[in-house]
């Protein structure tokens, strides 16, 4: 009987849902109101990177479902004003990000009260092995 309970415990423990993580992946923003491609990738060493109008990078920290971005730095390319505004708003949203959620190949970052940045794994992504 002890063996049965032990076996059942081990079986149920191994069925625990695998925790999803954005680390080692590259995503593309899929928010419909964004008229340009914006990417976001996560290196295993705590650095993130991406491309909007400019290439950008910085540091991220994940604890449970909370994500924070710091030290956002970018190149200094110029573009038409509406695209520059979209990029600035995107950077501000990343800075204000608080929680995230992952489902299959989607990543959602929630910021402020009602804002959501929604990403999908980039198909031609050169994912970084963990």
Task: Describe the function of each predicted region.
Residues 3-13:
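Sec-dependent N-terminal signal peptides
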Residues 13-130:
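Lipid interaction determinants
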């Amino acid at each position: 009987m002890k063996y049965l309970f032990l076996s059942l415990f081990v079986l149920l423990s191994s069925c625990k849902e695998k925790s999803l993580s954005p680390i080692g992946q590259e995503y593309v923003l899929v928010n419909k109101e964004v008229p340009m491609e914006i990417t976001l990738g996560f290196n295993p060493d705590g650095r993130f990177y991406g491309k909007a109008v400019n290439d950008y990078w910085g540091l991220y920290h994940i604890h449970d479902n909370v994500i924070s971005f710091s030290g956002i730095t970018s190149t200094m390319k110029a573009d038409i004003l509406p695209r520059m505004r979209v990029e600035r708003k995107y950077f501000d949203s990343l800075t204000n990000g608080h929680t995230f959620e992952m489902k299959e190949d989607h990543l959602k970052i929630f910021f402020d009260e009602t804002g959501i940045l929604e990403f999908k794994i980039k198909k031609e992504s050169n994912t970084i092995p963990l």
